[in-house]
């Protein structure tokens, strides 16, 4: 089994922890990672961009001047695309952006992203982070103790309880830091709500609590 150091919130190394090879130590499949991120970003698009064609712009129903004998170029409508205030040629219209992946590829993409972070040495496991009340200063102190100050950090918490929600709120005002809760595994048992490939790759460091590791291994192992 893969091993990684386990830290406490003071930044002290309290010993190694075993990680399942089938989740954290596979050979990253970059093709599947790309497909998953492409699906995420595509499905996040609103698809509401809209422009008017020359037939939809108000006005322009008559010919602006006669065809011949004016010395000017012939024109058919003041709402043609090359006119100021004219319609848009080949512009966007509202549409649905949607892509999907099968369960096997979703699981592989997530395990590949986790394995990549471990392979790079950018995965940190912490025994526990809990706050009685939201306080940005406290989370800054924890990240500083872990040597993660002024870095892009993704912190993944195991479940939605008050002490963890307070940690999530505490991270809102720290630039580059995102805190998510990996709660309620999906009904197809192939993913963890909140934990996704794009966020893992979009942050330089991945911080998992010991409870988060257990949940990930339970779902993906």
From Swiss-Prot:
Similarity-based family: Belongs to the universal ribosomal protein uL4 family.
Keyword Coiled coil attributed: no
Name under which the protein is recorded: Large ribosomal subunit protein uL4
Keywords: Ribonucleoprotein, Ribosomal protein, RNA-binding, rRNA-binding
GO MF terms, alphabetically ordered: rRNA binding; structural constituent of ribosome
Known role: One of the primary rRNA binding proteins, this protein initially binds near the 5'-end of the 23S rRNA. It is important during the early stages of 50S assembly. It makes multiple contacts with different domains of the 23S rRNA in the assembled 50S subunit and ribosome.
UniProt cross-references to PANTHER family, sorted A to Z: 50S RIBOSOMAL PROTEIN L4, LARGE RIBOSOMAL SUBUNIT PROTEIN UL4M
Disulfide bonds: none
GO biological process, one term: translation
């Amino acid at each position: 089994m893969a091993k990684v150091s386990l830290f406490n919130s003071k930044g002290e190394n309290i010993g190694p922890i075993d990680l399942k090879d089938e989740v954290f130590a596979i050979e990253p499949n970059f093709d599947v990672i790309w497909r998953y991120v492409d699906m995420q970003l595509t499905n996040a698009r609103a698809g509401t961009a809209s422009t008017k064609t020359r037939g939809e712009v108000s006005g322009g129903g008559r010919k602006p001047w006669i065809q011949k004998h004016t010395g000017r170029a012939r024109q058919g409508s003041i709402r043609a695309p090359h006119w100021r205030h004219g319609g848009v040629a080949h512009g966007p219209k509202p549409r649905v952006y949607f892509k999907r992946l099968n369960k096997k590829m979703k699981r592989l993409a997530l395990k590949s992203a986790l394995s990549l972070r471990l392979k790079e040495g950018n995965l940190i496991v912490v025994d526990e982070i809990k706050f009685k009340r939201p306080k940005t200063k406290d989370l800054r102190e924890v990240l500083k103790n872990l040597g993660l100050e002024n870095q892009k950090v993704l912190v993944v918490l195991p479940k939605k309880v008050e002490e963890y929600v307070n940690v999530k709120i505490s991270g809102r005002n720290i630039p580059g830091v995102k805190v998510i809760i990996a709660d309620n595994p999906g009904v197809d048992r192939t993913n963890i709500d909140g934990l996704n490939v794009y966020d893992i790759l979009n942050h330089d460091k991945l911080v998992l609590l010991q409870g988060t590791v257990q949940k990930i291994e339970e779902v993906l192992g």
